């Protein structure tokens, strides 16, 4: 069965979801029937075809009135600001991928369902009242058919959760800190301009800018046992894509850096293949652009202090890796069916 999806919000993640779908060869499993985006149709087509981070899209893209064509596939374009008015029932939409970055509450999810969608997947963290939050590769097996409103967590949560799980399973984590070194985002300024967050009033291309993060809450949402045992900070840096995460954890069992690397490399080749990758090459952030993994461990940066303090550096393409996980989670949601009494 081919899953019929609609995308609500066609920004960085929405466009990368479409590109990832076509590049990954999963069009027999998923088809995009509609895109809802307030921008004009010509702009939608142009930004899908041409992308500063990911280059020119390999598929032919054209737009005719309110239809977007990717190759021979036709996708209906909508410009509807009200979720409840979207024609999901008419279009027989199985799963809505809400990639607005704005909506994320149960109320918003239920509005999509009332419009006729069978299930909803948010591309960002949602409230505690959602049916599930999935970090694919770690907890997708907990999905049930009755889980209709789901969050795919965040790009940084998807990056760090598999590594935390591996270290905790092997050595027993007592506590940890996380520093996210994140590329600039759309909520920052090109030149100095007003913003409620005074640090974000400053030009994104000229400063390393500390910002708030809810990553610690994201960790404890997946692993409740770490409540009050993880803290996180974040800085934005003047690059347009790829993120590095500095993870430091104290563990119960004594360990050496080489043993940590052996553990993570084995996982990348085995149970977490396709989700986690491992490298010891002398690479920099641009080398991880367009990498589909959730996390790439840089083994050259692993350190252990006093046998119990582990520091790792983990890379991710915060756009492309996350877009691929959106597709994975969509398939997982569809695989368990659309019976809602389970």
UniProtKB/Swiss-Prot annotation:
Pathway: Cofactor biosynthesis; pyridoxine 5'-phosphate biosynthesis; pyridoxine 5'-phosphate from D-erythrose 4-phosphate: step 1/5. GO terms for biological process: pyridoxal phosphate biosynthetic process; pyridoxine biosynthetic process. Its EC number is 1.2.1.72. The active site is at 155 (nucleophile). The record marks 182 as: Activates thiol group during catalysis. Belongs to the glyceraldehyde-3-phosphate dehydrogenase family. Epd subfamily. Catalyzes the NAD-dependent conversion of D-erythrose 4-phosphate to 4-phosphoerythronate. This is D-erythrose-4-phosphate dehydrogenase. It comes from Klebsiella pneumoniae subsp. pneumoniae (strain ATCC 700721 / MGH 78578).
